[in-house]
Amino acid sequence: MRIIVAVLIVGGGLVTMSFAQTPQPGSDPNFTGVVTVMDAKDITGGRRNFEAGARTAWHSHENGQLIYAQSGRMRTGRRGQGFKEYDAGGSEYTPPNVEHWHGATPKEPLVQVNIQFGGATKWLTKTTDEEYNKR
């Protein structure tokens, strides 16, 4: 719990700092070429722990979503396709308005980080066991 609180405090400070900065191109010893800090007001994110077999309902994101397996093993599915699995460090981008679900594999938990690029999330029906296990 202390780790989560520390991450939220540090993360909140970084987000606040990024919002406070005005985009300005310039020279920076950490970059080569012109690099500009951009506004991130529409970007949101989250971190979730899924127990083995846990998953989201079907849903879509108006402007897409990036999901990342921080630890454990992740399973994802898109409407009309079989599932895919990713080890820790793996990620998947889901384009705008593509119906999908994601969560842990049947035998392994998952810590997932997700990033949305603005817009609404449209929640649909629960992902059935048959859909979750469809190859």
Question: What are the language-model segments listed below?
Answer:
Residues 49-50, 61-76, 115:
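Short, conserved beta-strand element in jelly-roll/cupin
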Residues 52, 70, 80, 96, ...:
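Short loop/turn positions at the edges of beta-strands in beta-sheet-rich folds
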Residues 2-47, 57, 85, 122-135:
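A short, N-terminal "cap"/entry segment at the start of jelly-roll beta-barrel domains
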Residues 96-121:
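Ligand-binding loop in jelly-roll beta-barrel domains
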